[in-house]
Amino acid sequence: MRFRIYKRKVLILTLVVAACGFVLWSSNGRQRKSDALGPPLLDAEPVRGAGHLAVSVGIRRVSNESAAPLVPAVPRPEVDNLTLRYRSLVYQLNFDQMLRNVGNDGTWSPGELVLVVQVHNRPEYLRLLIDSLRKAQGIQEVLVIFSHDFWSAEINSLISRVDFCPVLQVFFPFSIQLYPNEFPGSDPRDCPRDLKKNAALKLGCINAEYPDSFGHYREAKFSQTKHHWWWKLHFVWERVKVLQDYTGLILFLEEDHYLAPDFYHVFKKMWKLKQQECPGCDVLSLGTYTTIRSFYGIADKVDVKTWKSTEHNMGLALTRDAYQKLIECTDTFCTYDDYNWDWTLQYLTLACLPKIWKVLVPQAPRIFHAGDCGMHHKKTCRPSTQSAQIESLLNSNKQYLFPETLVIGEKFPMAAISPPRKNGGWGDIRDHELCKSYRRLQ
């Protein structure tokens, strides 16, 4: 009798466990199905611990992370499921390349200009850029590609409201956010920035053999911008399907730029002038950082100069031919010890490109840098103040905008320009090899 009672209890318990298991399995199955059928998680919050500052051109600064005490190398952490889901989603979105604000008949093709905006995590400035685009004449003809290295609900919401031009979003697949605890992010086994090489070798940190030119070890947040820029350059020219046979120009912007309402009007006239009077010009730029109070007498003039990274890195426009010459310099770009993409380009004009770059640039700028604060500046970020100053300048000169013709104002002597100095931050062989690999990625 005791044996039969015990058997009955075991049977009942088994049935209860089986029923609970079935309920849990059904619940998970429904969730998986919901995830599979639901829209992409473009409005999801960023991965934990992924907040990083944007990097601008300037001198490399010591971050608070560098002051961490020395600790022995630790085992590599496991990747959490949320991070893996984001990696998978980024891959899928980059493959799908869903265009918005175009017809569904499959006949749409880009015009003579495409904009590519490198976006990090400054939505307050991105909002200003989008507002300036909205005011630009002819913008409905221009494809705008937003290239992201940070995923946030606020940023994606901003871009979802762009209804005035064709839009494509792509995502840098090797961001710190997608690799928060391993390379290309910050691996806990990496050497601390200021550790001497001998001490690093004794400690056994994984990049001990590869400090930069100043004896410092890599900091992921400084390395990311150069990685993103080079990946984006290759991806838009080689992997964006709608641009496979594109013969126009691509204008490269950043999230803290601001465009004049006649930028597209002026750009088209610059391109025509380049073809007619400056066939030797390699690139176009929409402006410099020089402070201008009045457009009087200069609104219809452009100059021919030697390209200089500290002056002509805003609104840089490249043809496919210029891109192909750049990509042939992949090894030089990817191994030059400077974490700034533009100062590295300056080095390429001396060390690798067939000749120094000749740039066509307007005397009255059609692009402005609204984000003159942040990592390399001590100013407080006040986007509304900066945008008000730019709008005031444009309003006070609106009678000079949209010139009927453009003429070359000055042709400056062409002379090689060396980078002011090498900033370092790019000595790690892992950065070199990842950077080189973008050319091989499908």
From Swiss-Prot:
Segments traversing the membrane: 10-29
Positions with a binding annotation for Mn(2+): 256, 369
All ranges on the Cytoplasmic side of the membrane: 1-9
Residues where substrate binds: 118-122, 149, 224-228, 293
Free-text tissue specificity from the UniProt record: Detected in liver, lung, testis, kidney, brain, spleen, thymus, uterus and intestine.
GO process annotations (BP): oligosaccharide biosynthetic process; protein N-linked glycosylation via asparagine
Record-annotated disulphide pairs: 191-205, 278-281, 329-352, 334-435, 373-381
Disruption of the gene: reported phenotype: Decreased embryonic survival between 9 and 15 dpc. Surviving embryos are about 20% smaller than their littermates by 15 dpc. Most of the newborn pups die during the first week after birth, and none live longer than 4 weeks. Pups are about half the size of their littermates 8 days after birth, have dismorphic facial features and severe locomotor deficits. Pups display impaired muscle development and defects in bone development including a hunched spinal column, plus poorly calcified and brittle bones in vertebrae, ribs, femur and skull.
InterPro entries in the cross-refs: GlcNAc_II, Nucleotide-diphossugar_trans
Topological type in the membrane: Single-pass type II membrane protein
One Pfam family, short name: MGAT2
Entry keyword set: Disulfide bond, Glycoprotein, Glycosyltransferase, Golgi apparatus, Manganese, Membrane, Metal-binding, Signal-anchor, Transferase, Transmembrane, Transmembrane helix
GO cellular component, one term: Golgi membrane
Substrates-to-products reaction catalysed: an N(4)-{beta-D-GlcNAc-(1->2)-alpha-D-Man-(1->3)-[alpha-D-Man-(1->6)]-beta-D-Man-(1->4)-beta-D-GlcNAc-(1->4)-beta-D-GlcNAc}-L-asparaginyl-[protein] + UDP-N-acetyl-alpha-D-glucosamine = N(4)-{beta-D-GlcNAc-(1->2)-alpha-D-Man-(1->3)-[beta-D-GlcNAc-(1->2)-alpha-D-Man-(1->6)]-beta-D-Man-(1->4)-beta-D-GlcNAc-(1->4)-beta-D-GlcNAc}-L-asparaginyl-[protein] + UDP + H(+)
A molecular function (GO) term: manganese ion binding
Subunit structure, interactors included: Homodimer.
Family named by the database record: Belongs to the glycosyltransferase 16 (GT16) protein family.
Role of this protein: Plays an essential role in protein N-glycosylation. Catalyzes the transfer of N-acetylglucosamine (GlcNAc) onto the free terminal mannose moiety in the core structure of the nascent N-linked glycan chain, giving rise to the second branch in complex glycans.
Entry protein name: Alpha-1,6-mannosyl-glycoprotein 2-beta-N-acetylglucosaminyltransferase
Species assigned in the record: Mus musculus
Gene that specifies this protein: Mgat2
